[in-house]
Amino acid sequence: MMNRVVLVGRLTKDPELRYTPAGVAVATFTLAVNRTFTNQQGEREADFINCVVWRKPAENVANFLKKGSMAGVDGRVQTRNYEGNDGKRVYVTEIVAESVQFLEPRNSNGGGGNNNYQGGNNNNNYNNGGNNFGQAPTNNGGFGQDQQQSQNQNYQSTNNDPFASDGKPIDISDDDLPF
């Protein structure tokens, strides 16, 4: 059996960070995910999916994501229930994120620098958005933000990314496209 969810969408509001009585960080947020089809009016509808992330990734989500940020979530579906104030059973279905990927550079969210954070508990070496060409991959489980920031201080700030958005349209013809 398998319980696996992969989502890409935008946060509908800033993440909420709380701590359990034992001091464990937990962040909750809602992701707006567009459907792949259009309705009768030709518009794409969206699903609003509640997500929860625990421990250090929760703190990173709260620190680096905000309303409108694009994020990728890899996790599982969980349904829990509790007794509400009126005595009725309340069921909650949410995504428990095992990994949260920040899919936009920090400077598009009001921050600065490269987006070299890889969220989650996995030890993969995927980088999303940072300009790390020619650097050796690190196996730090996604928690090397401080180390990466100190490494970036040793380099002069140059933008060698030909795909960086400087607000100008890209001059390309259809003949240049491979499809």
From Swiss-Prot:
Coiled coil: none annotated. Pfam families: SSB. Residues 115-130, 145-161 have a biased composition (Low complexity). Keywords: DNA damage, DNA recombination, DNA repair, DNA replication, DNA-binding. InterPro entries: NA-bd_OB-fold, Primosome_PriB/ssb, ssDNA-bd. A motif (Important for interaction with partner proteins) lies at residues 174-179. GO terms for biological process: DNA recombination; DNA repair; DNA replication. GO terms for cellular component: nucleoid. Residues 2-104 form the SSB domain. Residues 103-179 are annotated as: Disordered. GO terms for molecular function: single-stranded DNA binding. Plays an important role in DNA replication, recombination and repair. Binds to ssDNA and to an array of partner proteins to recruit them to their sites of action during DNA metabolism. Homotetramer. This is Single-stranded DNA-binding protein 1. It comes from Listeria innocua serovar 6a (strain ATCC BAA-680 / CLIP 11262). The lineage of its organism: Bacteria, Bacillati, Bacillota, Bacilli, Bacillales.
